[in-house]
Amino acid sequence: MQKDKKNYKLRKFGPITERRDYSITKHSLPVGDILATSKKSYQDFINKKIEELLNEIYPIEASNKEASLEYEKKSVKFELPFKKAEHENLQIKTCKAKKTNFSMKVYITLKKVVSQTGVVKKEKILLGEIPYITSSGSFIINGSEKVIVSQLIRSPGAYFGVSVRNKQSEDLFNKLEILPRIGSWIEVSHKVTSANLDAIKIKIDKNKNINIVTFLASFGLLADDIRYLFGKNEVLEETIRKNKTIDITEFSRQEIMDLCQEKIFRIIRKGDRISEESKRSLLSGMLFDKKRYNLSKTGRYMLNNKLSLVERITNTYLAQKVVSHLGNTFDVGTYVTYEIAKEIQESFEAKAKDNKSNLHLEKIPNINPDDVYYKINKDNKSLNKRINIARIKIWPTKRAMDANETPSEVIGNDPKATEEHLLLSDIIAAISYYLNLTVGIGQDDDPDSLMNKRIVSVGELLEGELRIALLKLEKATRERMGAKEPDKITAKNVTNNKLITNQMKTFFNTSKLAQFMDQINPLAEISNKRRVTSLGPGGLNRDTAQFEVRDVHSTHYGRICPIETPEGPNIGLILNYAIYSTVNELGFLQTPYYKVNDGVVDYNDVRYLTSYEEIGYAFAQSSVHVNDKNEIIDEQITIKKDYNYIIGSPKDIDFLEVSSKQIVSVAAAAIPFLENNDANRALMGSNMQRQAVPLIEAEAPLVATGIEADIAKFSSYNIVANNDGEVIYVDGTKIQVRTAKKIDTYNLKNFEKSNQGTIIQQKPIVKVGDHVKEGDLLVDGSSFKDGEMALGKNLLVGFTTWNGYNFEDAIIINERLVKDDVLTSIYIEEQTIQFRISKSSEDIMTRDIPNVSKYSMRNLDEFGIIKVGSEVVAGDVLVGRISPKGEENPSQEEKLLNAIFNQRPQNYKDTSLKVKNGHNGTVIHVEVLSRENGDILEDGLDSIIKVYIAQKRKIKVGDKMAGRHGNKGVISIILPEEDMPHLEDGTPLDIMLNPQGVPSRMNIGQVLEMHLGMAAKKLGTKFVTPSFDGIKKETIEDLLQEANLDKSGKQVVIDPITGEKFDNPISVGVIYMLKLNHMVDDKMHARSVGPYSLITQQPLGGKSQNGGQRFGEMETWALESYGASNILQEILTYKSDDIYSRNLVYKALVNDSAIPNPGMPESFNVLSNELKGLLMKLGITETESNSDELIQHFDHLGVEHE
């Protein structure tokens, strides 16, 4: 890195480009693999989760218990879709061509055990096929590249709400929800807005409310036990008073338990037969059985965190003397700080032999584990110990302590609990927390905080699908085993391996989370792989999602991008990871920080923290000034602590952000001067960069942000060296590198079609003799230049109006951009035809097509397939095919005679593949899949032919363009070079934008980019200006002067038509402009004759169906207001759905006779038939006797008349 005498450094971006860097942050953390999250999640799934699931499901015992199948531990074997890593791309190409899946086979070893004889027989079987992740983080399903989007959902755990509004009523409630990953939801609530105290009720799933005292009594806790446990609480007393079952003194504890269990059974299992067994096992099965209730590791972690004592006893006063496990004594009345609270909690967790504390876990009074964990504790004896709680007395305020009020009881759950299902201590601690909230102890939860949300990545989603499939497999296997003799059973004949394959197929083809990959350009692809959605199974619904859920939250900082989200109904529900964001093993989002010790930054100590772990620490921004000794030299700094901002000194800081772009996503980080733009426009800018089409000649921006080179490193459009070595061969199709052990060959992509029809092309950027290191770029893919992302072009822009042509954001461009192919892109269209074969008929490929002009078949070869390289226009035949009309089945004799005399019966019709309207171009590739070549095709298919047509699209009027700052517009006119305003040296402008588009949009970034771009062009250099650490206005002024330009950035511009200067100098500079994937060629559409709807007989709608334009109610008013009755009559009858009359009009036009009057529109008949369906007969009464023509017309239509 070369240091200049100026206040910048020259830094290298990519293998070639150097840029001037003026940023303050000197130690930005290098961007890691931006696609690592999904790849790591998938690897975790195949390495750990499959084994865990198989251990859960097996052994499977036959329904007659004569035999069982056991899984041999750690016997999972995978057959990957490629033998060596370097073959992966070749296999992916094959899967795309043959429309198959890129998947791996899963083999396991099962042991059959016969109960009577004890005979054991091992067998290796195929369990199924699971799609395999590519090295770029996508999946190939039926030949299409797909992405599994991560989901952001509420984490399992306990959540408390104070004065929450209920959906059904206007009342406010206190609420406790215990959410599992799998199992029954528990909701505890009581109304807080009514004049009288309300009883606390519990709801399990969506059943009726149960009084909480009845619920506790079903485990054996009576009124006195409840008062002893939870202390004095008026809401609790009211709940006990309103409960009728519990205070009846003549009943024993066991009888009360039975009564309460019966009452709960009748509510939850309404209508089911009740028995002693069923009522006792109901709650224990629903809440404490690990097979039916699963919190997951995350849920247990969340529950233990929330139900510990720390949160509730911090900032309170002790009402009992405490000796901690460290031997520290805290007297009655001690103010409890966060540190003391943690020490008290740890005293309950400490092992008995080292524990000097007077705090110990105590048993819940009068509880018998056999009643609570009925039947479950037979298999799991450790549950008998899980009736312990941590308990302490405190005063919530100093006033309560001084008044010597009755202390509050605070109960925590068993901190040693690791079970992934609920325990009685969890329920008691949760109810204690709920009651504490009524007296102001504890905190309610923010459902929108990332502390309470977790990421479900691809691995976990596939684990869920595999679990469903294995449960189906278990059931099917058990039934098959029961139906066979023990000695006839083999692992293979009772295991249906189609279940897993089909479950995966269904998920990848139908799930909302499996998306067709957005491949318009490399940024779109990376953005799609880093997307997070709150929708989907178990998530939110876009129609009911409230504003609060969609809003940016303070915990998103450094984890979720606050800018990149769609406009429209999904705003705030579909999000993107921030650049440095990672996911930990529990699914919580983390962001990295540098550790700061006593004002000194340790750049080697990078800590990844979740939003929960950030509590209690102080954080500083990355743009603080640091000296050579890594000491922070600013005296006063803005500090973030507990999600609030305060002013402090360097000594107060615990952590430092790792980069100024830490807050934003990859797409938002690619916007220069992001900090000078309004957030709404930045949102549009980041979304529109994803729509930029790759141009024929890529050009890197003069003003970049530095993220472009990082994107190049991790994009699947590029190829990086796998090993160190020397380049020994380079051409347009492959690169060979000699390494220490072997020769690595890298095959390049040429004219490949992306999912969206844009071109994927790779050009070598290395030469023979170059030495490359592992991870170095070897090629530039589409939209890359010299190892940097290059989505658009640097164009000379003037902000001026011109004869009203740039009204309302329209754009005026120079004809040079068309002539020199500056904004020309290539679009590839795939057209497919199938040849079917059956017993009675078959499609025939031929050049001999009836009733087709020779001109449209001029480029066919002798087989009837288009030649590669042919120029084709709409209507040209691509593949000749004739199909039987299907009226008659020829006899064997007729077939023989036709074959002998080489005759073709006349009942064949032309069903050839023809070029669609607007898809003119050059045939670049033809692909034939046939059974002859050994390709696997569907039943009834003999062959499939795919023709690829490339279309060169120059920029034209109606195309959409945009900058990187949300400044978008449509081209309104293309001016000849000689008519374009030019600078004093004769340089014509490339593009004219309306200056009125800047002030109200508040995206000033484009103005700064324009001035800096002009300086860059004049100085022959390039700049980097990272997000939130960009080049300052004063620096830009200095650079303009250095380039011998006016520091205002304005220049004299001459109107070539008059030769006069414009009245005032205008802002002229270089802006990076993008051509978007909204081209007029895809949108322009007209219809003369086309298809009609079957029922209404009205023309179809939309370009894809060659439909018409809807003439709606308001358009009818327009014609009515002008009195254009004849036109109106035509539009609503002949041209729409009057079938009979439209045929008469055609006849009249052919015969040159008078056009008849219109008749009855078909929609009238539809109405008449719908009324008949409602048993109403619609008839027509004539008043004129001379309307013979009308009578005939009604007779023809079948409408009754009098």
UniProtKB/Swiss-Prot annotation:
Subunit structure, interactors included: The RNAP catalytic core consists of 2 alpha, 1 beta, 1 beta' and 1 omega subunit. When a sigma factor is associated with the core the holoenzyme is formed, which can initiate transcription.
Keywords recorded for this protein, A-Z: DNA-directed RNA polymerase, Nucleotidyltransferase, Transcription, Transferase
Name of protein: DNA-directed RNA polymerase subunit beta
Function: DNA-dependent RNA polymerase catalyzes the transcription of DNA into RNA using the four ribonucleoside triphosphates as substrates.
Family: Belongs to the RNA polymerase beta chain family.
Catalytic activity entry: RNA(n) + a ribonucleoside 5'-triphosphate = RNA(n+1) + diphosphate
Organism placement in taxonomy: Bacteria, Bacillati, Mycoplasmatota, Mycoplasmoidales, Metamycoplasmataceae
Cystine connections: none
